[in-house]
Amino acid sequence: MRFIDEASITVISGKGGPGCVSFRRERFIERGGPNGGDGGKGGSVIFETDPAKRTLFDLRRQKIIRAKNGMPGLGSNKHGKNGVDLIIPVPPGTLVTDQETGAVLFDLTEPGTRITIAKGGRGGQGNKRFATSTHKAPRFAQPGMPGEEFHLKLELKLLADVGIVGLPNAGKSTLISKISSARPRIADYPFTTLTPSLGMVIPDFGEPFAVADIPGIIEGAHEGTGLGIQFLKHVERTGILIHLIDVSQIEPDNPLDAFNLINTELSLYSATLAKKPQLVVLNKIDLTGSMEKVEQFKKAYGTGELLTLSAATGEGTAKLIQILARQIAEHKPLERKSETDHGNK
């Protein structure tokens, strides 16, 4: 399944500055020759692939991106100041298409790549350029050339930075709806979620990041039980795992039963998957008797880091977002591969 982040924008490069009509004005020289300078070049709009960028969130809010115009030429043959190029960072894997035709214009895959999307207009020539042997005092100059304007659609195949795993009914859908933009179907029975959901989390500090709610993994998932293989493939492509546990289901005689079951399925499917960083989160602490269950789990779990929260009430979710934002910032950005074959959507 593809998770697509999209943005529709208009990019406009800067107009060239007009040339100047000017003549030398010096003492004792009644009729100086033309000395109008050329106008400055308009600024270009440039896309640069930046591995620190994970989403198109900022571009979705901008809509119109406009570079600076070039400045007019000046007397004394002074060239007008060029408009500053506008460099827009985009995530690697961004596909740029024409909104009207759907034609693929650029496929930005390599970090650090710079592509001029809209070239700035050329500055107009000053009147000095038009002086000839027969027309020594031209009183006109050239206007600056207009910039370019394009209506673009940007697409990014998202790889979730964070995957939420846990047994059915652990509260994954409720949690992702609380901390992100995702709105999955939620009900109080197992297997409500039958397909992965993706939500964007906007932390107070740091870059937005993507969280995937991976449908309930059950015993035998690595062998294909339920939709096991399909779900585990999604987990494999995330960077960090939230291991979500329903405290109401913790058994006093074996508090780590659910925790061990999920980790066993992950390790049997892929050794790489089993080594992914995990943040253990105990959910539903708003329920009666939950804190006793939390203590039972902590005692069996040992000194490892874990977090308690209630996805239903929101208690503890702000802290979870802070921890995830910090952990993601400490890891290298996920490698993204752009796919131009839209026929397999």
From Swiss-Prot:
GO terms for cellular component: cytoplasm. Its cofactor is Mg(2+). Keywords: Cytoplasm, GTP-binding, Hydrolase, Magnesium, Metal-binding, Nucleotide-binding. GTP binds at residues 166-173, 191-195, 213-216, 283-286, 310-312. Mg(2+) binds at residues 173, 193. Its EC number is 3.6.5.-. It is found in: Cytoplasm. Residues 1-159 form the Obg domain. One of its GO terms (biological process) is ribosome biogenesis. GO terms for molecular function: GTP binding; GTPase activity; magnesium ion binding. Residues 160-329 form the OBG-type G domain. It is an enzyme of class 3 (hydrolase). HAMAP family: GTPase_Obg (MF_01454). An essential GTPase which binds GTP, GDP and possibly (p)ppGpp with moderate affinity, with high nucleotide exchange rates and a fairly low GTP hydrolysis rate. Plays a role in control of the cell cycle, stress response, ribosome biogenesis and in those bacteria that undergo differentiation, in morphogenesis control. Monomer. This is GTPase Obg. It comes from Desulforapulum autotrophicum (strain ATCC 43914 / DSM 3382 / VKM B-1955 / HRM2). The gene is obg.
